[in-house]
A protein has these predicted regions:
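Extended two-metal-dependent nuclease catalytic cores across DNA- and RNA-processing enzymes
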Residues: 1-136
């Protein structure tokens, strides 16, 4: 469990239990884009709103990060020579994405691995409960 996982647990808990509460996350890490909603705003350390870096859909932001990887976190791209533009084409055409993953078993393995590493919904429930119990002390 890393710091971003703990923050994600807290944010999701607040979003669920207090849906109208405003949440501000200050970070340079784009992993948090998957948590954006109408009441959750992300600012970088230079006080710039990162919500503008979003695709407009947290699920698409998540898929983009899964496909293009993240060098700073040592997460490789799923496909060689695949940047944001190509990844967005795949995201907007799920059938094509699935076809590409089926054609390239190594890409499929990377996609599944990246999903587990990046997607906050893969945080085991028992760890989420430990985090929430700890912060409620």
């Amino acid at each position: 469990l890393e710091a971003d996982d703990i923050i994600a647990c807290c944010v999701r808990h607040i979003q669920k239990t207090q849906p109208n509460r405003k949440i501000y996350i200050i970070t340079n890490d784009h992993d948090y884009l998957q948590l954006i909603n109408s009441n959750t705003t992300i600012y970088n350390l230079q006080n710039k709103n990162l919500n503008n870096k979003s695709c407009g859909d947290p699920k698409k932001d998540l898929l983009l990060k899964i496909i293009v990887g993240d060098k700073s976190d040592n997460i490789p791209k799923c496909f060689k020579k695949c940047g944001n533009k190509t990844a967005l084409k795949l995201i907007n055409n799920p059938e094509l994405l699935q076809k590409k993953l089926q054609e390239n078993p190594q890409s499929k393995i990377l996609f599944e691995r990246n999903t587990q590493l990046i997607d906050f919904s893969y945080i085991p429930h028992e760890l989420q409960e430990h985090v929430l119990n700890f912060i409620s002390c």
